[in-house]
């Protein structure tokens, strides 16, 4: 089973990423579950998302404490220890950043396999907005191959109509531009 945990700030529409990835996996004949949880403090509000995908029925129904994959929609969230907490030793972290993987390793002490993508820039260039959900989904698909990239296109078109084409283009660009650097020993 592939277990993924997403971290985002409120308003980044991470809930849509969790839902679309879950629906795409089901459309491909896999078992999938996804849900989100909001947490807020007096300073700021954040959202965590959880996705499980498997070839077998999923009987767990809980938050993911030890994910195979952590997806961070805002690099500033890495300053919080709980974001990377529990990542499996063979786990992967995908991050929205303009920095190279070695810069992330130096800044945050990350040893996991890293996938980095400039989702903010892709969203601005293609969508004319800061909505990073489509580019981040492209990065997730590149790193995990959990579903074919094309599995998202009909879902985006169904949900967004003509704007779905632009969202799929952002997803495709992120898929191509995501840089993966293997885990440091």
Regions found by a protein language model. Give the residues of each.
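Active-site cofactor/cluster-binding pocket
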Residues: 1-185
């Amino acid at each position: 089973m592939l277990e993924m945990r997403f971290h985002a700030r409120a308003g980044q529409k991470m809930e849509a990423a969790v839902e679309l990835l879950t629906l795409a996996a089901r459309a491909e004949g896999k078992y999938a579950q996804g849900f989100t949880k909001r947490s807020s403090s007096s300073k700021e509000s954040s959202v965590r998302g959880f996705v499980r995908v498997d070839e077998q029925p999923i009987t767990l129904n809980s938050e993911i404490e030890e994910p195979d994959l952590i997806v961070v929609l805002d690099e500033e969230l890495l300053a919080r220890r709980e974001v990377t907490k529990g990542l499996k030793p063979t786990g992967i972290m995908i991050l929205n950043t303009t920095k190279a993987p070695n810069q992330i390793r130096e800044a945050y002490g990350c040893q996991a396999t890293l996938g980095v993508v400039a989702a903010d820039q892709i969203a601005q260039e293609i969508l004319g907005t800061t909505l990073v959900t489509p580019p981040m989904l492209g990065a997730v698909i590149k790193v995990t191959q959990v579903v074919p990239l094309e599995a998202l296109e009909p879902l985006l078109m169904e949900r967004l109509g003509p704007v779905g084409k632009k969202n799929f283009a952002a997803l495709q660009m992120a898929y191509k531009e995501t840089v993966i650097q293997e885990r440091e020993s």
